[in-house]
Amino acid sequence: MREEVYDISGMHCAACSASVEKVTRRLPGVERSDVNLVAERMTIVYDETQVTPEQIVAKVEKAGFGAKLHQEKQEAAPVQTGEDPEELELRRKKRELIVSAIFSCALLYVSMGQMLPFGLPALPLPDLFSMHTHSMNFAVLQLMLAIPVLYCGRNFFINGFQALFHGNPNMDSLVAIGSACSFVYSVVMMFLITDDVHGHVHNLYYESSAVVLTLVSLGKFMESRNMKKTKSAITALMRLTPDTALLADSGKEVPTSSVKAGDVLLVKPGTRIPLDGVVTKGESSVNEAMLTGESLPVEKAEGSEVIGGSVNENGVLYVKVTRVGEDTTLSRIIRFVEDAQGKKAPISRTADRVAGIFVPTVIAIAVLAAVIWAIAGKDFAFVLRVFTSVLVIACPCALGLATPTAIMVGTGLGAKHGILIRSGEILEVTHSVDTVVLDKTGTVTKGEPAVTEVCPAGGTAEGLLTIAAAVESVSQHPLAAAIVQAAQEKKLSTGKQPENFELLPGRGLRAALSGRTVLAGNRRLMEESGVDISALSEKADALAGQGETPMFFAADGALLGLISVADPVKETSAAAIAALHKQGLRVVLLTGDSRAAAEHIGALVGVDEVIPEVLPEEKAVHVQKLEAAGRKVMMVGDGINDAPALTAATVGCAIGSGSDIAIEAADIVLMRSDLEDVPRALRLSALTLRDIKQNLFWAFCYNTIGIPIAAGLLYALGGPLLSPMFAGAAMSLSSVCVVGNALRLGTVKL
């Protein structure tokens, strides 16, 4: 099976996207076809031995739409500086809307001004256009005022009738039929006007035809403008990569797209880092807020990794490029968000099914309502009014926009906070999670050993740490690196390098330092060497019971002291777990540590359950056991050995600093490596799902109530008959409300 993404053009409402899905799903070998109206994109899974891309494109084009294989954008490429096509289209719509509004207002004044009880004495019509004495002139004036409006709304007729002729009627078809019927009927009535017969002048409905188009155009313009805002997260990310980069060796400024991995770039203060890399020289603070959601600048020095698109704030950095093109962190983020916005949530399936039959059903209801009122004895003008109102008030757009707009805003909001969500389906499924399983190392803890206690047997802690760092400086062990790091942080000088360094596997090391024989290692090494450790033995046992690693240091057979190294708990872990509890979730800690050490960490952060002594390959088994017991599990981890467990869980969540394999296996990626983003992701899921439900409820209720009213239900019960103009206004408002509600989600504080 092969999965491809196609850009689809010519779609205007949910009926359009449903038509594209319907025709492509009928192709042999197509397993799945999902069309996202907002993203204007189709994701299709098919058997390449049974159908080709050319056949897929041909099928879509035959249905009246455009299709081309989606090309991955080169995010590292320079940003286009020309006019944004979307912005140009918005400007065109705005110009045409202004023209339509001016002529529609004039038409309303001419056609209906004399019907007002108080009249319009300030702007009287010349006698030449009097409805009573010069009926033909009165009718021709209305026609002349209506024609510019119809021209500005020409796309409704072009798209609507094209879709109708292709057998895929859409919202434009409804508007086009309704407006055209009013216009044609008015033209016929106009030609029936003679000097002797003026009665037909009362049957002119040019204003209905024109005002409906103007109001629907207003709704479309507002919808397009708001839809542009829903895509702002992607747009902002794509603008982060600078157009050019400065090569350190030659000092030349070159296009970012021409930079290769291994090149060294010079990044000046106040400029953006062009691509991912490692700092080879210099120190600075780097602002990564747009990429990770981290509000505070991050300190960078030699050896630090930097992300392309982040801002170098105050120092000069030399950066060796490690990733270019589609492999950069920024490109991966954009691809992640685009994929999420292009995929549908299961909750939208009902709306999609309704949208597929919506327009034909509305046309049938309009015809049926017209026939019933005609049989009831109403004149043609009344019947036409009902027919037009039903067509115009129906809004498949509200149904089609309900889910994708909320998902687009929700995933964009997540990306803004450093929370990447793989798909709309994950957004929906995440809301059902009731258990969060946390891997310990790198998730609850920092994942890097650090000195937690320095206990001298005599002398000072600084003196002990100085000797320990000097001895350990030649060792490659992670625990040794932690001790050296602690000494550097306290700005302690380690003095001379140790001599006669000897590694003692399973015990520690021996070295000569300033004429003294220094031992560094565990209890076994001290006992074998005859060093008395009784003064710190109980302390060592207590630290070991907490999951820490105590190391003894001795010189010439005398105990110098004890240094304990551990993987410290992240500062935010306890608060994050408390937030998960507030959301009603059960939190489980999964670790390979001993029971005593695991329970100590669990008590520190406040988890509900601890599962200790778990081998890496057993993590997925424990997740599956929880799932089998009826729990909906979110697994949170960062390492390669977490990938199977991430896949086994209902939702897999990878900490951003983790391995590429873990990130690829995950459904959600936390760019900040902050456990507090887990409850934020769950809240985002709940808010987005609530927004989708609100949108769908509004869309279904609007159509369920609006169509019967337009068909004359209120009139039959003694109430008023809905005008096509008000029907058009209501239809426009429904789409705007749906998009506006989705945009409201973007203002929420997670």
Label for each model-derived stretch:
Residues 1-139, 227, 331, 335-343, ...:
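Flexible metal-binding regulatory segments at protein termini and peripheral loops
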Residues 1-2, 18, 421, 433, ...:
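Conserved ATP-binding TGD loop and adjacent catalytic N/P-domain core of P-type ATPases
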Residues 81, 197, 210-269, 300, ...:
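Juxtamembrane coupling segments of multi-pass membrane pumps/enzymes
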Residues 81-103, 159-182, 334-366, 383, ...:
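Soluble-to-membrane junctions at the N-terminal ends of transmembrane alpha-helices
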Residues 95, 310, 434-476, 484, ...:
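ATP-driven catalytic headpiece of P-type ATPases
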